[in-house]
Amino acid sequence: MLNFLQSVQFVKEVEKKIIEYDKDIAFNEAIILYEIAKHDADLVKNLASTINQHYFKNTIELCSIYPAKVGLCPQDCKFCSQSIHHSCLIEIKDLAALDEVIEYLEYVISFPIKRFCLVTSGEKLDDSEFEKILDIYSHISKNYNILLCASLGFLTQERAKKLLKVGVVKYHNNLETSSTYFKNICSTHTQQQKIETLKIAKEAGLQICSGGIISMGEDMIERIKLAFELRELDVDSVPINILNPIKGTPLEDIKIIDKNEIFITLALFRIVLPKKTILLAGGKENALGDMEKMAYECGVNGCMVGNYLTTRGMGIREKIEMLESLDLKFQTNMHNN
């Protein structure tokens, strides 16, 4: 174990490697940073903040999602209230109509939100549903000034190209957890299927968004593995969700990891993925409460605002006021795609 002075020196060397030499850290270096964080968490959190400030200044990207289809999912992901394998009380919702989506979108665009994503339950949409969702995206793309993302399950090359054609710029599919822990979370599909979908999206010209959920019983080593696996895929943005244990799911009795461990996790993701958008997503209000502000000092430069798929988030206006109090500037769709 390094002493304090050795820890300070190691952190300085990592900072120089990333910022001055534009090099990625190795897995063993991330493990050493975690060991340092156990005793001197501020060293690692401050490093993450320095890296974030170097690449993103004091800007933050906001996105909002709309649950365009909810429930009746045949997959058995242990965290999810939408699975038919679990006994959760949620409102089942068929594919949304255009006017429903537009009503929410027009509320969203009254705020400085950069991205808007339609999310559907299930392995994938059937052909009829997919054509309807294409029509919705086409209408939004032609009439509204917001970047469009999609989270519609597994993809084919043909579908990826169609999404790109109607104005979608980014495709989302979470790895959820590390490759070695995934078997503990889901048995009805493989993580490799998710990876293939991300590769298909990328090959078609879409940006890719993929992250995971922390506090599902995994340890920090598994989280670090996930960060490196996402780096290997060269994802563009990384949503980090914190488990919100939902009654009726197999994970309903899990105790959420403590706040400091969450902050260290976020910091390590920033250090491993220095140039990517690290987005604080679902579960943040439940897990962090008033301490959510501290997450944005640990390398986070993105925030999902509004409600989630089946759980409520903080009101958009309230969230934006909180972020403004931190002197953060909101990215627009002029800040790259």
Swiss-Prot record:
Binding residues annotated for [4Fe-4S] cluster, in chain numbering: C73, C77, C80
SUPFAM superfamilies tied to this protein: Radical SAM enzymes
Family that this chain belongs to: Belongs to the radical SAM superfamily. Biotin synthase family.
Protein purpose: Catalyzes the conversion of dethiobiotin (DTB) to biotin by the insertion of a sulfur atom into dethiobiotin via a radical-based mechanism.
Entry annotated with the keyword 4Fe-4S: yes
Catalytic activity: (4R,5S)-dethiobiotin + (sulfur carrier)-SH + 2 reduced [2Fe-2S]-[ferredoxin] + 2 S-adenosyl-L-methionine = (sulfur carrier)-H + biotin + 2 5'-deoxyadenosine + 2 L-methionine + 2 oxidized [2Fe-2S]-[ferredoxin]
EC number, UniProt record: 2.8.1.6
Domain (Radical SAM core): residue spans on this chain: 55-284
An individual GO BP term: biotin biosynthetic process
InterPro entries: Aldolase_TIM (IPR013785), BATS_dom (IPR010722), Biotin_synth/BioAB (IPR002684), Biotin_synthase (IPR024177), Elp3/MiaA/NifB-like_rSAM (IPR006638), rSAM (IPR007197)
Quaternary structure, from the entry: Homodimer.
Gene (name only): bioB
Presence of the UniProt keyword Transmembrane helix in the record: no
Cofactor note text: Binds 1 [4Fe-4S] cluster. The cluster is coordinated with 3 cysteines and an exchangeable S-adenosyl-L-methionine.
Designated name of the protein: Biotin synthase
CDD domains reported for this sequence: Radical_SAM
Cofactor(s) needed for function: [4Fe-4S] cluster; [2Fe-2S] cluster
Keyword line: 2Fe-2S, 4Fe-4S, Biotin biosynthesis, Iron, Iron-sulfur, Metal-binding, S-adenosyl-L-methionine, Transferase
Example GO molecular function: 4 iron, 4 sulfur cluster binding
Pathway assigned in UniProt: Cofactor biosynthesis; biotin biosynthesis; biotin from 7,8-diaminononanoate: step 2/2
Residues annotated as binding [2Fe-2S] cluster: C117, C149, C209
